[in-house]
A protein has these predicted regions:
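Histidine- and aromatic-enriched segments that form or immediately flank copper-ligand environments
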Residues: 51-71, 100
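Positively charged n-region of N-terminal signal peptides that target proteins for export
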Residues: 1-4
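Beta-strand cores of secreted/periplasmic/IMS beta-sandwich domains, seen most often
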Residues: 35-52, 74-82, 88-90
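N-terminal signal peptide c-region/cleavage motif recognized by signal peptidases
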Residues: 12-13
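Extracellular/periplasmic metallocenter environments
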Residues: 18-23, 30, 70-105
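Glycine-rich phosphate-binding "P-loop"
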Residues: 16-17, 56
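Short, surface-exposed secondary-structure edge patches
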Residues: 33-35, 66
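Short alpha-helix capping/helix-loop boundary micro-motifs
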Residues: 29-31, 61
Length: 105
């Protein structure tokens, strides 16, 4: 019984271990890095840290994702698995400066 409980407790960690983690920072109303290369066909965990004193919205029509990130905080967005290609994203509150692309190869 103990072993079964241990296996059940570890199962979520084993599932998450298959996700690839990428970090994206919002600083001065820009995404850093502005380009991220990821493997096609894999689920991606994107951790977005907003270092600005104002909120920003991660928005991508290509990825069908929107997420408001409050100032000085982090958010997680799961994407994929992606087909090979380019997937653009913007910071909807600062579209002129906050933009980038995820390239799946």
């Amino acid at each position: 019984m103990r072993y079964l409980l241990l296996i059940l407790m570890l199962f979520p960690a084993l599932v998450l271990a298959d996700d690839l983690v990428y970090k994206l920072t919002i600083r001065d109303h820009r995404f850093e890095p502005a380009e991220i290369q990821v493997p096609a066909g894999k689920k991606i965990k994107l951790i977005i840290e907003n270092q600005d004193p104002s909120a920003e919205e991660f928005d991508s029509h290509d990825l069908n994702r929107e997420k408001v990130i409050p100032p000085k905080s982090k958010a997680t967005v799961f994407i994929g698995p992606l087909s090979p290609g380019r997937y653009s994203f913007i910071g909807e509150f600062h579209e002129k400066t906050a933009n980038g692309v995820i390239i799946a190869e």
